[in-house]
UniProtKB/Swiss-Prot annotation:
GO biological process: N-acetylglucosamine metabolic process; peptidoglycan turnover
Record carries keyword Zinc: yes
Role, per record: Catalyzes the phosphorylation of N-acetyl-D-glucosamine (GlcNAc) derived from cell-wall degradation, yielding GlcNAc-6-P.
Disulfide bonds: none
Reactions catalysed according to its record: N-acetyl-D-glucosamine + ATP = N-acetyl-D-glucosamine 6-phosphate + ADP + H(+)
InterPro entries given in the database record: ATPase_NBD, N-acetyl-D-glucosamine_kinase, ROK, ROK_cs
Official protein name in the record: N-acetyl-D-glucosamine kinase
Classification via CDD domains: ASKHA_NBD_ROK_NAGK
Binding-site positions, Zn(2+): 157, 177, 179, 184
Lineage, top ranks: Bacteria, Pseudomonadati, Pseudomonadota, Gammaproteobacteria, Enterobacterales
Cross-referenced Pfam families: ROK
SUPFAM superfamilies according to UniProt: Actin-like ATPase domain
Length: 303
């Protein structure tokens, strides 16, 4: 059996998957915020419960919003303070007496989608998350590409390309990002960025769901906003696709629930790609909230 943990700032979710990649059981508990020992106990107790329930010693994979430090194995995870700065993988492997695998949650999302029955035909899969922030992951032949510093797929921290500034205006604000840089694309393409763009142009502080509701009602202002957003997304994605050239792009995060994102994006891409480039298949994520658990469990399918 394959145990996949999706760990966030508020919850630890465990999903148990069989050899056919089907979910057999899941359970969620609150994430301890202050005590590393309590955090380890919570994970180990869930593993012990799953072992008892299924009568076996399952493989353990963990997806967490952070990056392992490749030099010493410690974890940087600002949203999970109890585990940040700790050698999480080594400690859990020792306590559970098995090989625990760990990756960031965006890579687990991408891995989950790449192992979907319909998508396994594609050698190079790119997961793109348009949610609170912008991120993603790259999967090649069923395995995550992490890079030397575990920052592969941090698409949100690419800066706006010159074509975006030409389209939006050279005086377009280069917003300061939490990473310390200015003009990172997640400040414009995330759910928060989607709302910020609307307020910037129309001086109305609406949230993304409210804007999308207006769009669905045929509101001309909301429709103009969505056109502008999709054009900006296409410009930025064009740069990424020129570097990566994936077979498939799977879009997740809150904005993926807005059908225009996946149905109207492909037609905008060719003018931002090389003439010989082919637009990849673009699909909405298939596995929703279960994607993090699935991808973490499938870290043990990558041998």
């Amino acid at each position: 059996m394959y145990y996949g943990f999706d760990i966030g700032g508020t919850k630890i979710a465990l999903g148990v998957f069989d050899s056919g990649r089907q979910l057999q059981w899941e359970k969620r508990v609150p994430t301890p915020r202050d005590s590393y020992d309590a955090f380890l106990d919570a994970v180990c107790e869930l593993v012990a419960e799953a072992d008892r329930r299924f009568g076996c010693k399952g493989s353990v994979g963990i997806g967490i919003p952070g990056m392992p430090e490749t030099e010493d194995g410690t974890l940087y995870a600002a949203n999970v303070p109890a585990a940040s700065g700790k050698p999480l993988r080594a400690d859990l492997s020792a306590r559970l007496d098995r090989d625990v695998r760990l990756d960031n949650d965006a890579n687990c999302f991408a891995l989950s989608e790449a192992w979907d029955d319909e998508f396994t035909q594609y050698p190079l899969v790119m997961g793109l998350i348009l949610g609170t922030g912008v991120g993603g992951g790259l999967i090649f032949n069923g395995k995550p590409i992490t890079g030397k510093s575990y920052i592969t797929g941090e698409f949100g921290h690419m800066r706006l390309p010159v074509d975006a500034l030409t389209m939006m205006g050279l005086d377009f604000p280069l917003r300061r990002c939490g990473c310390g840089q200015h003009g990172c694309i997640e400040n414009y393409l995330s759910g928060r960025g989607f709302a910020w763009l609307y307020q910037h142009y129309y001086h109305q502080p609406l949230q993304a769901p409210e804007i999308i509701a207006l769009y669905d009602q045929g509101d001309e202002q909301a429709r103009a906003h969505v056109e502008r957003y999709l054009d900006l997304l296409a410009v930025c994605l064009g740069n990424i696709l020129t570097i990566v050239d994936p077979d498939l792009v799977v879009i997740g995060g809150g904005l993926s629930n807005f059908p225009a994102i996946t149905t109207q994006l492909a037609e905008r891409l060719p003018r931002h790609l090389l003439p010989v480039a082919r637009v990849p298949r673009i699909e909405r994520a298939r596995h929703g909230d279960a994607g993090g658990m699935r991808g973490a469990a499938f870290l043990h399918l990558t041998d």
